[in-house]
């Protein structure tokens, strides 16, 4: 309403603004998943450290369980992994990949989304072309350039990984 009546100042930032990231909550694009995680634990977690490793919210439980001296339950499958060494600065890498439920996978700098990727009902955008998508997140964090046609071997590898994980769950 306000925008129609008076407009918004140039460069207005709205609640939920994703900046240069594509889409938003409910989508497998970076604005739907990428969040900052700020950790402070003097004497344990190195101060001022910035790391872009893959660390998912499902990793908190096994990580904190380990830090507290507890075992993770063995009577059920725990999807998260212990990221204690990453958190404490003893390792620079996180998980090898991250699976986007019924959509695709991120491995290293690459993100693959399958042609029929599922978007939750509240996703900002689902008018996308129904084609395989591949993005280099190191050079294109906004996911603006689909590189699938230029890197068919990577698409094939990540498509297979997506299928394998889908069968496992």
Annotate each predicted stretch with a short phrase.
Residues 150-153, 157-164:
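A non-catalytic, amphipathic alpha-helix used as a structural packing/dimerization or gating element
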Residues 46, 143-144:
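Glycine- and acidic
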Residues 2-30, 44-49, 53-133, 137, ...:
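C-terminal cap/loop subdomain of S1 sulfatases and analogous C-terminal strand-loop tails that border
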Residues 34-35:
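Catalytic cores of eukaryotic secretory-pathway lumenal/extracellular enzymes that build
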Residues 140:
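Intrinsically disordered, low-complexity polar regions and short flexible loop motifs
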Residues 1, 145-153:
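Active-site-proximal N-terminal segment of extracellular/periplasmic enzymes that hydrolyze or transfer
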Residues 38-40:
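Short beta-strand-to-turn element immediately C-terminal to the catalytic PLP-Schiff-base lysine
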């Amino acid at each position: 309403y306000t925008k129609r009546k008076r407009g918004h100042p140039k460069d207005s930032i709205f609640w939920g603004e994703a900046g240069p990231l594509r889409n938003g909550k409910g989508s497998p694009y970076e604005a739907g998943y990428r969040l900052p995680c700020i950790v402070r634990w003097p004497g344990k977690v190195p101060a001022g450290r910035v790391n872009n490793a893959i660390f998912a919210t499902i990793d908190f439980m096994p990580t904190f369980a380990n830090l507290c001296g507890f075992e993770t339950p063995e009577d059920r499958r725990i999807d998260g992994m212990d990221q204690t060494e990453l958190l404490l600065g003893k390792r620079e890498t996180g998980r090898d990949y991250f699976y986007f439920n019924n959509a695709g996978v991120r491995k290293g700098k690459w993100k693959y989304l399958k042609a029929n990727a599922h978007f939750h009902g509240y996703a900002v955008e689902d008018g996308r072309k129904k084609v395989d998508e591949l993005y280099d997140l190191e050079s294109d964090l906004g996911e603006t350039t689909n590189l699938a046609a230029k890197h068919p071997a990577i698409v094939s590898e990540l498509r297979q990984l997506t299928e394998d994980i889908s069968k496992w769950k």
